[in-house]
């Protein structure tokens, strides 16, 4: 209730301006274990039925915060206190970049969706590593999302991903290669069999940590399956589906540029994930993201084959109680259907 009133004021302000103010507060809170413990006492939720061991990592629950919120890995401790089972920091690039011109973050309030054209704005890998290490270790697994610098030509993309990975080798529990943001020119062109294979072969030689590929929801199904297969054969441990969409028909008044996320993406993301799971469930770890805002949708994605979930836009629209609400209701749903734990639910629709 309190957040609903607060949100009315915040939503009168520029979206990126609000995000920056919230980030400043979260950075300050991250400095204090006391305040982080208070946040967790109020907004966290722990239940052994939600725990899982995946790729050697212990996840207290399957609900993660997607990349893009904490671009510089500077407020992880405060964010995880809100009840997330894990968090993905970034996107970090090899060198700092300011991103695209403002305004570049927009709300579609009626659709409970966001449109962002940020462009991987971040302080660069060196400062990202420094920020991460300041409060490490963390209580949950932390992924590092890696992207290509805007000024790097396609022919040099592999070397650029290698450079940013090298700088980040000592931080994080897993890495996600982001080839699917619509806000870096031609980045999505790298979503092809040859490049994906080279990328994961290279990364596999550099680290034993789990590696993920994040894919776009706008790929043709056959192309998506082909690229996914190429990634897995080259050493990818999992697939994150999906990033934002450029399908502007999903909202009433779209802006010219930027990817859409939130409730408008629910159906599209679910359809892509369903095809992905049909082909690759039990062959790799599948992470579902896109339009998840309540326990019912979370439960459906897990039954479809998702070992893990990620949210972003729903956190903006629903506020700090979101994780707790989803997780409590998720336990009720799995118990109602006779499951003893979330582990038993994964892929139930495919059995």
From Swiss-Prot:
Q: Which domain of life is it from?
A: Bacteria
Q: Name one GO molecular function term.
A: dihydroorotate dehydrogenase (quinone) activity
Keyword Cell membrane carried by entry:
yes
For membrane topology, the record states: Peripheral membrane protein
Assigned GO CC terms:
cytoplasm; plasma membrane
Q: Does the keyword Membrane apply?
A: yes
As for family, the record states: Belongs to the dihydroorotate dehydrogenase family. Type 2 subfamily.
Listed under subunit, the entry gives: Monomer.
What this protein is called in its record is: Dihydroorotate dehydrogenase (quinone)
User: Which species is listed as the source?
Assistant: Helicobacter acinonychis (strain Sheeba)
């Amino acid at each position: 209730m309190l957040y609903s009133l607060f949100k009315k004021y915040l939503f009168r302000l520029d979206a990126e301006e609000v995000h920056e103010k919230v980030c400043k507060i979260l950075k300050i809170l991250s400095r204090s274990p006391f305040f982080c413990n208070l946040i967790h006492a109020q907004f966290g939720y722990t239940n052994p039925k939600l725990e899982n061991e995946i790729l050697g990592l212990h996840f207290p629950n399957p609900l993660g915060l997607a990349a893009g919120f904490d671009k510089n890995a500077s407020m992880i401790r405060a964010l995880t206190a809100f009840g997330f089972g894990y968090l993905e920091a970034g996107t970090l690039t090899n060198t700092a970049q300011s991103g695209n011109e403002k305004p570049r973050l927009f709300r579609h309030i009626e659709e409970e969706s966001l449109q962002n054209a940020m462009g991987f704005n971040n302080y660069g890998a060196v400062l990202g590593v420094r920020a991460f290490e300041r409060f490490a270790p963390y209580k949950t697994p932390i992924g590092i999302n890696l992207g290509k610098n805007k000024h790097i030509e396609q022919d040099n993309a592999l070397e650029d991903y290698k450079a940013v990975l090298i700088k980040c080798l000592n931080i994080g529990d897993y890495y996600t290669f982001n080839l699917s943001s619509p806000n870096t020119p031609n980045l999505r062109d790298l979503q092809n069999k040859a490049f994906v294979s080279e990328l994961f072969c290279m990364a596999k030689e550099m680290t034993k940590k789990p590696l993920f590929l994040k894919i776009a929801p706008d790929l043709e199904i056959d192309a998506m399956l082909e690229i996914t297969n190429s990634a897995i054969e080259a050493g990818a441990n999992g697939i994150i589906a999906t990033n934002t969409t450029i399908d502007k028909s999903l909202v009433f008044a779209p802006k010219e540029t930027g990817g859409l996320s939130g409730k408008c993406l629910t159906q599209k993301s679910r359809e892509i994930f369903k095809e992905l799971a049909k082909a690759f469930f039990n062959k790799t770890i599948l992470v579902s993201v896109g339009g998840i805002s309540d326990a019912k949708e979370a439960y459906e994605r897990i039954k479809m084959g998702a070992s893990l979930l990620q949210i972003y836009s729903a956190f903006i629209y629903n506020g700090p109680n979101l994780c707790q609400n989803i997780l409590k209701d998720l336990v009720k749903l799995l118990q109602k259907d006779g499951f003893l734990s979330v582990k038993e639910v994964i892929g139930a629709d495919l059995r």
